[in-house]
Structures are given as structure tokens and as C-alpha cells.
Amino acid sequence: VALYELIERLQAHAASALAWFDNFDLLVTPTVAAPPGVLGDYLNRYVSGLGSAFTRPLNVTGQPAMSIPLGWPDDGLPRGVQLVAAYGREDLLVRVASALEEAAPWSHRKPAL
């Protein structure tokens, strides 16, 4: 595949993904596709795709996104959600993240290492 063809395919993918936001304000996904691993295991998760399955597509579309901790299961390790908005809607991300933190405060929590 020629480089220009790849660029055209990526641009078409981005346009399709962005059109989704014509009907919705926000997309909420897990930040990663698996529970947190042990310290030093990130490279294995990244190579397998589990570390970036939900975040990687946004590198193509260029949409604003943020990840915040939202759950703390019994293992004491935070689970994150990724908030994704349309172009130029960083304000929406910050407002929603602020409301979620107010409803379920987490800044005082620290995972055991």
C-alpha cells in the first residue's frame, strides 16, 4: 500500500468516527482492555494491544480525550474510564470529569505498590 493510500484510509476512518458525534456528545470507554497488571508489565500489555486498544484509535482521529479513575475494586487498583468528545469540546470533558470526581471522590486514594 502506498503511503498516500494509507493516509487516505486513515482520513476516511477519522471522518467516519467523527460523524458518530453528530448524534452523541460523549463516548465513555474503559481506558485499557484488561485490569491493571503488576509493576513493570506495561510493555507486555502494550505489545499485546491490551494497553492501547481503546486509546489508539484516537491517535488517528485526533479527538480530545481524558482518562480518570472511576472504580476501586477489592484489589485496591484503580480502574479508569476514558471520556472522548468531538473536536473542540475539551470543555465538556473537563465538566464531566469534574462531576464524576465530585460524585465519587478519588484524589485521596492511592494504590499499594
PLM features: residue spans?
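Serine-dependent amide/ester hydrolase catalytic core
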Residues: 1-60, 110-113
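Structural helix-boundary/capping segments
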Residues: 4, 60-113
